[in-house]
Amino acid sequence: MDEKEIQRLVEEVSLQYFGMPFLHKVKFNSRLRTTGGRYLLKSHNVELNYRYYEMYGKEELIGIIKHELCHYHLHITGRGYKHRDRDFRELLKKVDAPRFCKRMINEEKEKKIYKYECMECLLQYVRRRQINTKRYVCGKCKGKLKPISKTS
């Protein structure tokens, strides 16, 4: 789905469920990580998370669009557009929009663990980040560190 298709879909959903046109722009924002979408108050544009479309499909995306359009239409008409406002919650129920989107299934990255050992006192260090062994030394005896293993 590209920018033109998503723009057309949002305009259709707006007319179908709200009876009002969507007059601004919608786009996918690849930087969104934990949210399905967001409504921008200053520009009145809507940004959507493409990964929700990839993961859950068009139906979930339409739910997110309806949620963001609730913010949009309430803000445009000067009514309560925030999550805590009664107008917002009533409009969500009316158009059957989700209050929250599904949780993203994180493909957990393998956490790397680096092990270092002091060459003098044999103290072992376990770290999640790499250490520059030319710059850092053992905190106990000031001896040189050598990498032992890197586990993923």
UniProtKB/Swiss-Prot annotation:
Binds 1 zinc ion. One of its GO terms (biological process) is response to stress. HAMAP family: SprT_like. It comes from Bacillus cereus (strain G9842). This is Protein SprT-like. The active site is at 68. Residues 7-147 form the SprT-like domain. It comes from the Bacteria. One of its GO terms (cellular component) is cytoplasm. Belongs to the SprT family. Its main location: cytoplasm. Keywords: Cytoplasm, Metal-binding, Zinc.
